[in-house]
Regions:
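Charge-patterned, long linear interaction tracts outside catalytic cores
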Residues: 117-124
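Charged, alpha-helix-enriched surfaces in structured cytosolic catalytic cores
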Residues: 1, 5, 49, 70, ...
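N-terminal positively charged helical leader segments and presequences
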Residues: 33-55, 63-64
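Short, ordered loop/turn segments at secondary-structure junctions
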Residues: 24, 45, 70-73, 93
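Mid-chain, well-packed structural core segment of small domains
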Residues: 54-85
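C-terminal structural segments of small proteins and small subunits
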Residues: 76-114
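Signal for well-folded cores of large energy- and translation-related assemblies
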Residues: 11, 31, 59, 80, ...
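N-terminal first-folded block
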Residues: 5-42
Length: 124
């Protein structure tokens, strides 16, 4: 459920024009500092080279990188694209907070699921 909310909030960023789409465009925007990038979201099925490139650039420019549990096709669909999208970057502070809120909810749900799994396996 939270995954849907997360993808919907990313789609909202796209509709608001507060999203940079694609690894080359993100790297160029970071280098040129044309738009302030708040958060980079990467698909889970990226190649090692793409993942390293995003990780290195986000570290160098001090931008948070989050790897989603969503493949590139699903990420692309969330923003209205028909193909694979490796990464997107959020440029609006308020929308960034919305996306981060949904990321935090998803992580807390996952940690609850993990602790429940541990409890159920220890009682068996």
């Amino acid at each position: 459920m939270t995954s849907d909310k997360l993808l919907q909030s990313i789609g909202l960023c796209a509709k608001a024009g507060a999203l940079i789409v694609g690894t080359p465009m993100i790297c160029e925007a970071l280098k040129a500092s044309k738009k302030r990038i708040c958060l980079i979201l990467s698909a889970s099925d990226n190649s090692d080279n793409t993942a390293k490139r995003l990780r290195d650039r986000s570290t160098h420019y001090g931008v948070t990188l989050h790897i989603l549990e969503v493949d590139g096709v699903r990420l692309g669909r969330a923003i209205g694209k028909s193909g694979h999208v490796a990464a997107v970057a959020v440029t609006d502070e308020n929308l960034c907070r919305l996306v981060q809120k949904h990321l935090a909810q998803k992580q807390s749900e996952q940690s609850e699921d993990t602790s429940q799994d541990l409890l159920s396996s220890s009682t068996k």
